[in-house]
Amino acid sequence: MYSEWRSLHLVIQNDQGHTSVLHSYPESVGREVANAVVRPLGQALGHSPVSASQSLLYTDKDVKWTMEVICYGLTLPLDGETVKYCVDVYTDWIMALVLPKDSIPLPVIKEPNLYIQSILKHLQNLFVPRQEQGSSQIRLCLQVLRAIQKLARESSIMARETWEVLLLFLLQINDILLAPPTVQGGIAENLAEKLIGVLFEVWLLACTRCFPTPPYWKTAKEMVANWRHHPAVVEQWSKVICALTSRLLRFTYGPSFPPFKVPDEDANLIPPEMDNECIAQTWFRFLHMLSNPVDLSNPAVISSTPKFQEQFLNVSGMPQELSQYPCLKHLPQIFFRAMRGISCLVDAFLGISRPRSDSAPPTPVNRLSMPQSAAVNTTPPHNRRHRAVTVNKATMKTSTVTTAHTSKVQHQASSTSPLSSPNQTSSEPRPLPAPRRPKVNSILNLFGSWLFDAAFVHCKLHNGINRDSSMTASFIQILLSYKSSIATQASMEFRRKGSQMSTDTMVSNPVFDASEFPDNYEAGRAEACGTLCRIFCSKKTGEEILPAYLSSVILNSPPLFCCDLKGIDVVVPYFISALETILPDRELSKFKSYVNPTELRRSSINILLSLLPLPHHFGTVRSEVVLEGKFSNDDSSSYDKPITFLSLKLRLVNILIGALQTETDPNNTQMILGAMLNIVQDSALLEALGCQMEMGGGENNLKSHSRTNSGISSASGGSTEPTTPDSERPAQALLRDYGSTDSAAGLLIRSIHLVTQRLNSQWRQDMSISLAALELLSGLAKVKVMVDLGDRKRAISSVCSYIVYQCSRPAPLHSRDLHSMIVAAFQCLCVWLTEHPDMLDEKDCLKEVLEIVELGISGSKSKNSEQEVKYKGDKEPNPASMRVKDAAEATLTCIMQLLGAFPSPSGPASPCSLVNETTLIKYSRLPTINKHSFRYFVLDNSVILAMLEQPLGNEQNDFFPSVTVLVRGMSGRLAWAQQLCLLPRGAKANQKLFVPEPRPVPKNDVGFKYSVKHRPFPEEVDKIPFVKADLSIPDLHEIVTEELEERHEKLRSGMAQQIAYEMHLEQQSEGELQKRSFPDPVTDCKPPPPAQEFQTARLFLSHFGFLSLEALKEPANSRLPPHLIALDSTIPGFFDDIGYLDLLPCRPFDTVFIFYMKPGQKTNQEILKNVESSRNVQPHFLEFLLSLGWSVDVGRHPGWTGHVSTSWSINSCDDGEGSEQDEVTSSEDVGASIFNGQKKVLYYADALTEIAFVVPSPVESLTDSLESNISDQDSDSNMDLMPGILKQPPLTLELVPNHTDSLNSSQRLSPSSRMKKLPQGRPVPPLGPETRVSVVWVERYDDIENFPLSDLMTEISTGVETTANSSTSLRSTTLEKEVPVIFIHPLNTGLFRIKIQGATGKFNMVIPLVDGMIVSRRALGFLVRQTVINICRRKRLESDSYSPPHVRRKQKITDIVNKYRNKQLEPEFYTALFQEVGLKNCSS
């Protein structure tokens, strides 16, 4: 204000008017001269005060010489009468300007202004502190001050020069006494009130008669800033400024404005003749004369004045501590008095017509001389009971030495009802500010900077935002400090203990650092907070608050609704109105000159995140306090109707959607996306619980309210005209068609539309937003709400289009980050397909998805719109990257193997078959089966087939060829039990499969049998005549001789015997034939019996076409093995590697460690012990645990358990002993510690991931852990196929094993003993890199900083870290930073506040949970689980060393093929197929 004017400091310093010529002489000379000269003058005044004769001095020369002597006399010690005579003479002479007397020299009477100017300069010497005789000096100083006071009041001929000298004189004597540090009982302490009172009174008189020039105002302001460590300075300033304000309001706002009543004593300080213009000018200058009153809260600023710096070094040259200055201990009280004075001014401008009983400017209090109980009332404004009062102050009486200055406040009743505190129980109505009060902006322009900064005193920001020095303090810190000052009957504490307040009332405040916060400044801060609250609550309807203030409130208020402030929900509608002004506005042009628009939008979004759960949580609860319109004196009754929280839902949804449409900042956009999943899931769960009926009841109010209350902004200065389509506010104009988004289905559909539209337009270039949008779509796919097929198809099609665009980008733009976006899109596609498998029933959707898979694997589509179909064999594979190809292959596997098949009958814990070679051997009833009975083949270098040809002897039909095949591929281990079926199922039950059809019974009656002798030739032969030729052949008897006759006879006899024998046999045969049945089983034709022994492995391979010659040949120009190869299982280590392959999971696995932290806890042991009993934790914590997953038994669980030593076990003991033991121990209250991973864990799994939730707790003894380890090893004794090293005993450094008694208590109670179940240094499959997430339930939000994450690192071991290749020391230093932590703080409202640490990295924040978000009880478990899934997926995308599960399995299969391939020639291979296996090893 006076920056261009010079100060008068140099003029004062160079002025030598207070020196005398006698100062040049020795001290003895000056003393003697002064005593001799002054005594006659003083005695003349003392002996004849009434009839005083003429003065002894007649000429100007005499007077000037005498004044030189008196000037020196004023510097003498007070042990004599000389100084008193000097004071008497000068106080008599200065009355020449009031009423000339004979005792006054004639030259003085003739030129009083000239002489009195010199006298005033000489009187400065009196006020120089003496070492002794303090009471005498005080009496003399008061005499001079009274004379000065009378001079200023009664003189009418004082010239301007004299006024200026008088003002400088008063400034100098005040500076002499008040600028140095106050000495207890010193002259400054006793004269401070009178000194500053006379200065201000004379200054006001000067303003009336001779208005001071700007240099005087500037000098006064600079000097007053050096005296502020005196309570009287602030007290007198408060008196004067209140008196001036009372006069100012009287003519500024007219007689109808409520008068600001001040005590008559204070009102008399203002000269009656002071005109209105002078009052206005004087008021503004006096307002700033105290400089910034917030400096009173900073001892370093107050002690930086020159006088303090002079005394900062003591005589020995050693610096003193600031705490050694007792006067600085008064600063909290002085600060409070300054804020009280400003509070009174604000009340006056607001038109609160009656001052509060404790708001009048109080008198100074000497804390050193008064008892503590007499301390002033420092009740914060929030807790005051305001009564109608008129403040009258008793006259101040001043003592000489030890008189304490007190004041008496008399209260008089009034007929009106004044301002009451919000928590009062009386029926007094809340006072209304005056209708003609000034605007909020005007009041804030005057006092806002001071009040904001005062409310910000000793506050420490924890949100990392640097506040510009020109910005006002944050409204959230104001309200928080206000809350900390009024909590727990703080008013009674203030009344009893003054401004001292226990820090316990602010322990729960996250903004303040209790170790640095001086509790005795709370009174002043609370006064400023209350004043600001009254200012903002007095805003008129339709009044526009300047963007500078509105943006400051919003920018600094994100945690406002997260801190359990009582009654804070009353302001929810007004914050919603402010958000409706900011978030749908894309440019924010009117705020740009005050704040960063991006930061303003971010703060607004944070507030929105904290408001979204309120409508669902409070539902139809009505707000009984409706502030809007109450202070405007409007006749409109629309604001008087209580509104329900549920009616605010549509407004919040509209703001959310509008913010998404206008947001451009990536971080802000991700926060909005997280909020969308929050509101959609919460709505879905609420409707699923049957609450949609209640929601429907408030639907009419909801829609009508959104049109009335949203149409006019109470915070943005919008038009007060009725809402019309042309004059709608920006939010409604932008969101006019979103009326159906209040239901879960409507929210889901609109979210899908908005996100998919922007995913393929604005967001596809931004990786962070793209990942967040894909995570949102994945979360929306899991929301259990029925929506149309077209909307779901839109989401899938959008993701496919996104992948096409990213893959088609030019090669120079391809990078790892781009490929990470494509991989994330494939993962999102898998989520949608697994959650909605019926989508692939649509031909178009199936075609689009398979084309995208083809694009990812091969790099191009076979069919494009502009090209002919290009077949796979003709295409050259050129995927975007191997990561993209792997993701596409995983999607194809998901489509072919998981869709519609998850969860399997074996449960969601494992998508694989819970069968391996050991299981088949264990449950087979054939003693000849062992592990060598399996044939092992590999198909296409990617699938291992383990074939068991022998039937299992169970329900399989032994009459048919059967083969049991264990298929180990990239997607896991699957068991197929197959039989060769040639007949229908019904024919299998018929045992006459190979019996021919029955024949008819033959007829034995064959008719008559005739004996007919058959001729060799027909009879006609005998009738043919012979010819000569016939006679040429003689007859037999003609040529037979005797010898021949004998032979002939012999032959005839033999023939006869033969004929007889044959006839006998024929008869015998006919007899036997007649005795036989028909048909004859000997001769009957029958089918061959079925085969009983089969080489089913050869049949299986042959039937599937794997035994062709081409399949056994080495591919030309390739290092790949043939399509079919055999493995040699007799090579040592084969079954270890097979078990090693089975340990590789077939889907990602994550681990979450959950801790419970009670107030004040800092050590890991305290935190771990909390979960040992359900009585130690809040009931909502146990409910939260059960919402994360279901309980599983670690010993029988085939999935991930949180530690590699107990995970993926399929051959554990399955008898009833464990369950019986659990039943016995279940009666004990073990709380959440039952899920510590030793016996049980909480588990969640879907088709694409599995999560183990472990609640670490102290372990009773290491012996129990070792015993459980031994029992686990016994139960797994049949796991022949697990790696051999798994069956080794734990490696320790103990010389004598199994001696655990020597362990100290810390080792026996170490919760990390479960780590010792896994032998140190054991090689395990490359399961990493892993991401371990910690979830911490904190009862007190302040304890987040004390969470000992580094100490708990040993408790969150999963065994996977042993597979890391990096050194242990390196991992120990970086591991803590790699662990994301989700803090959950339960609020008193039943909602939950979220704090996330360590979840940001290369890919920025992870949704849906966002730092600062408020979550409902229903959606907490789902959102935490979804956030964990997204965090771990992000970490895997970020890791360079991560490989998908199917890739790791494929690599291991390739390794097994290379190590155990049976390199046989084709003949040898075929020969081996016909050989039996396993028989030779039956005994092994």
Swiss-Prot record:
Detected in brain, thymus, lung, heart, spleen, liver and testis (at protein level). The modification Phosphoserine is found at S359, S421, S710, S1275. Residues 1138-1382 form the Rap-GAP domain. Residues 1302-1313 have a biased composition (Low complexity). Residues 355-437, 697-728, 1301-1325 are annotated as: Disordered. It comes from the Eukaryota. The keyword Iron-sulfur does not apply. This is Ral GTPase-activating protein subunit beta. It comes from Rattus norvegicus.
